[in-house]
């Protein structure tokens, strides 16, 4: 899908050198909505256990807005770049459909220890079936059932094609319905 300049889309972007949270604060000031997938990290420091909430992917940020407006703000933030994919010989910014982004954010916001972030090339989507979760914490989320190399159980995947995927295990078979 080629994004139009005046169409509101979620754009997958990269804020180099791990500055995605700095960019997110700048975008808040500019009144532009953004999303950075976050996770809890627990580390032991001496005798204490410290829990931090950190970005799941160091440079990744999703920005909602008209491409023209994002370009304007991007001019003030030299380390913010579109993530692109080649289409017809051009590198086109990745625009994420609203419904897909809402599903992805819902899963990320409910993540627990059973969830993990998976790079796109580690998942073979052709073996999975499209399913909808009908119960539990992930009710109404749609994704695929897949087998990830090195994992014993099937996992539920919600992905943003070519960018990132969230993988969750522990969803009961009776909480799934096949779609499509």
Regions found by a protein language model. Give the residues of each.
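Short coil-to-beta-strand transition motifs
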Residues: 127, 134-142
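Acidic-enriched and Gly/Ser
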Residues: 1-130, 146-148, 152-155, 159-180
């Amino acid at each position: 899908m080629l994004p139009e300049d005046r169409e509101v889309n979620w754009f997958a972007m990269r804020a180099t050198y791990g500055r995605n949270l700095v960019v997110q604060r700048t975008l808040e000031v500019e009144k532009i909505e953004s999303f950075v997938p976050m996770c809890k990290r627990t580390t032991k420091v001496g005798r204490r256990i410290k829990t931090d909430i950190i970005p799941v992917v160091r440079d990744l940020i999703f920005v909602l807005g008209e491409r023209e407006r994002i370009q304007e703000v991007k001019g003030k933030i030299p380390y913010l770049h579109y993530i692109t994919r080649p289409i017809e010989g051009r590198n086109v910014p990745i625009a994420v459909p609203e419904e897909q982004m809402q599903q992805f954010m819902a899963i990320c916001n409910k993540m627990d220890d059973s969830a993990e972030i998976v790079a796109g090339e580690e998942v073979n989507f052709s073996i999975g079936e499209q399913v909808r979760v009908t119960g539990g914490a992930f009710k109404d989320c749609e994704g695929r059932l897949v087998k990830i190399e090195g994992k014993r159980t099937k996992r539920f995947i919600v992905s943003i094609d070519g960018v990132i995927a969230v993988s969750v295990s522990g969803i009961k078979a009776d909480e799934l319905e096949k779609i499509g």
